[in-house]
Swiss-Prot record:
Belongs to the thymidine/pyrimidine-nucleoside phosphorylase family. Homodimer. GO terms for molecular function: 1,4-alpha-oligoglucan phosphorylase activity; thymidine phosphorylase activity. Pathway: Pyrimidine metabolism; dTMP biosynthesis via salvage pathway; dTMP from thymine: step 1/2. GO terms for biological process: pyrimidine nucleobase metabolic process; thymidine metabolic process. It is an enzyme of class 2 (transferase). It comes from the Bacteria. This is Thymidine phosphorylase. It catalyses: thymidine + phosphate = 2-deoxy-alpha-D-ribose 1-phosphate + thymine. Its EC number is 2.4.2.4. The keyword Transferase applies. NCBIfam families: PRK05820.1, T_phosphoryl, Y_phosphoryl. It comes from Sinorhizobium fredii (strain NBRC 101917 / NGR234).
Length: 438
């Protein structure tokens, strides 16, 4: 006989281990509303204090996955692979990665999210493209994935609905940072997308949600262990987020940066290292490449041949965007009325930056949300960001502020200059790929 919800809560509060049936019953009540908001909050707090072992977290992930629709791609006969990032600043990797990997053979049905806190959201970036539909019908989504090889859309109401309710309650009960609940939340949505393989980008640094190396590794290990326990071939790369990844932060600006990357104009950058590392790992996971070096060679060929750009263009068009978007992006992406230079305040080397504050500055410009119902100004942001280690002279531009008006641009410009430290000596370089968790 199933335990009453309060008995499940009591068992977890007291440090007990819940079995699969107990977790499934609780999640069923979470999804259908028969368990009260107070009981859900108590369960979340009990989990925050007592934690979960791997088997419990696998059971919670699968139960939340099974609370709604599960996509089935078996009829396509191609590997189904995806990537998830825990969020950063100037992180537009998904925009390039999906068409690059699709050009190499696998299908990439990417279900993405909006901006969260100081980090940008893939959907917000894509919505800077006129007509782009992030909520196509399930039939159109499948058709585009079949024809193009990839499609980037938003979560539907019927994918992991139990997670939506649990997350909303976690958000107001100080339980967002529970590793088991983070793990189940991320993976339930990804597993509902019908993936066979998953590669995770777990960010570490002052522009990520986790700034502590040990906590970051704990989360990466939890995600990898639980996803593999749930039957999805998964690994994680911990990547550096102590400076913006792209040289632009902001929605339309990051789309323009994506197009420059797909034209081959960003080779050798930290962004390029991350895109190629994830493309290589995804192709190995999909068994399209024997090892990462072979996967990177395939990805580089897809980029240099123009195949990846063609797939991006077709994806945009099939999801409602202009057919000639990649050729005439300047005609379609709105431009900010005011652009001002952020000058270096002294001679020296860019030694460090407050990455989170750069993300918050873009939100202050209107490029992100402080409330869920806020409208985003897709035009605004930062561009021309110089990477750390660059030698600069006093007065030289280290960034450009794109804003809705001159007054706003100048106010943010004065803040941005203070977010950079300039030193006499060149700083030691940091690897962008910190570690690999399997």
């Amino acid at each position: 006989m199933a335990l009453l919800p309060q008995e499940v809560i009591r068992k977890k509060r007291d440090g007990g281990r819940l079995d699969r049936a107990e977790i499934a019953d609780f999640v069923s009540g979470l999804a259908d509303g028969s368990i009260s908001e107070g009981q859900v909050a108590a369960f979340a707090m009990a989990t925050w204090f007592s934690g979960m072992n791997r088997d419990e977290c696998v059971a919670l992930t699968l139960a939340m996955r099974d609370s709604g629709d599960i996509l089935d791609w078996s009829e396509f006969g191609r590997p189904i692979v995806d990537k998830h990032s825990t969020g950063g600043v100037g992180d537009n990797v998904s925009l390039m990665l999906a068409p690059i990997v699709a050009a190499c053979g696998p299908n990439v049905p990417m279900i993405s999210g909006r901006g969260l806190g100081h980090t940008g959201g893939t959907l917000d970036k894509l919505e800077s493209i006129p007509g782009y539909n992030i909520q196509p019908s399930p039939e159109l989504f499948r058709q585009i994935v079949d024809e193009v090889g990839c499609a980037i859309i938003g979560q539907t109401a019927n994918l992991a609905p139990a997670d939506k309710r649990l997350y909303a309650i976690r958000d107001v009960t100080a339980t967002v940072d529970s590793v088991p609940l983070i793990t189940a939340s991320i993976l339930s949505k990804k597993l509902a997308a019908g993936l066979q393989s998953l590669v995770l980008d777990v960010k570490l640094g002052n522009g990520s949600f986790m700034t502590d190396a040990r906590a970051t590794k704990t989360l990466a290990r939890s995600l990898v262990d639980v996803a593999n326990g749930a039957g999805v071939n998964t690994l994680a790369l911990i990547t550096d987020m102590n400076e913006p990844l792209a040289d632009a932060v902001g929605n339309a600006l990051e789309v323009e940066n994506c197009l420059a990357y797909l034209r081959g104009e960003k080779s050798g950058t930290r962004l390029d290292q991350v895109v190629m590392a994830f493309a290589a790992e995804m192709l190995v996971a999909a068994r399209m490449a024997a090892h990462p070096a072979a996967g990177e060679a395939m990805a580089r060929q897809a980029l240099e041949s123009g195949d990846a750009m063609e797939r991006f263009a077709l994806m945009v068009h099939r999801l409602g965007g202009p057919a000639d978007f990649v050729d005439r992006s300047e005609a379609y992406l709105e431009k900010a009325p005011a652009v001002v230079i952020v000058p270096a305040n002294r001679d020296g080397y860019l030694a460090a930056c407050e990455t989170r504050e750069l993300g918050m500055a873009v939100i202050a410009l209107g490029g992100g949300r402080t409330r869920p119902d806020d409208r985003i100004d897709h035009r605004v942001g930062l561009a021309g960001l110089k990477p750390l280690g660059t030698k600069v002279e006093r007065g030289e531009p280290i960034a450009f502020v794109h804003a809705a008006d001159r007054q706003q641009a100048e106010a943010v410009r004065d803040r941005i200059a203070g977010f950079y430290a300039i030193a006499d000596e060149r700083p030691a370089s940091r690897p962008v790929i910190v570690s690999r968790i399997t």
